[in-house]
Amino acid sequence: MKKVKEALSLLDEGENSIRHNRSRDIPKLRLGASSTLTRYVLLSHLENYIARFPHVRITISCQSTYQTLQLLDEEKIDLGLIGRPQKLRGYYFQPLLKIQDTFVCTQQYLENQKKLYPDEPLIQAATFMMLDEDNITRQTVNTQLKEHHVELSHILEVTTMDLLIQFAEIGLGIACVIRDFYKKRAGRRNSGGSTGRTFFSAA
């Protein structure tokens, strides 16, 4: 717990916290995050941080949320960037941003489903692409679906958010993604953003 608070202080109070000590040791900051959060959240913060404090040696361990928590328990990292699991106690959390889980697909996929299965509800006919059961995003969405008595008939599990996005873009099914991350990725390729794509809010 002490190391986590010290790491947060290092980020927030950089000019006061990061100094060479009397033995001139190089300051170190050990971070843990999933590959998705590293790509879509951490990198932009690190770019500015490194520019301000180029003398800090930073290491990043890309792991799942629960593996990141384990590294914190073992004091192998100082700070973890994670999606907060429900009912988790014993850690100090500093909120960074709110995310919205969203189902996304191409307009063509929806049209094809209506042609192929005109009498079936989309929930029963479509293929829904989700992260694996151990993922925090998947667990959160599962809880929301259960609360609304929604049961998906056809689920394709995928290991990474990037693959979910790519599969949705080629019309393989309806992907459950983090909305802002999807829009960032789409925006880099197309200034028109979500043109030709349909969103279904899940949160």
What are these regions (language model features)?
Residues L69, D73, F93, Y117-E120, ...:
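Short hydrophobic/charged patches on amphipathic alpha-helices used for structural packing
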Residues E111-K114, A126-H148:
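Secondary-structure junction motif
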Residues I26-R89, V158:
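Central regulatory/effector-binding core of bacterial HTH transcription factors
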Residues L88-P95, I99, L163-A203:
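Beta-alpha-beta core module
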Residues M1-H20:
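Alpha-helical "hinge/linker" immediately C-terminal to small N-terminal DNA-binding modules
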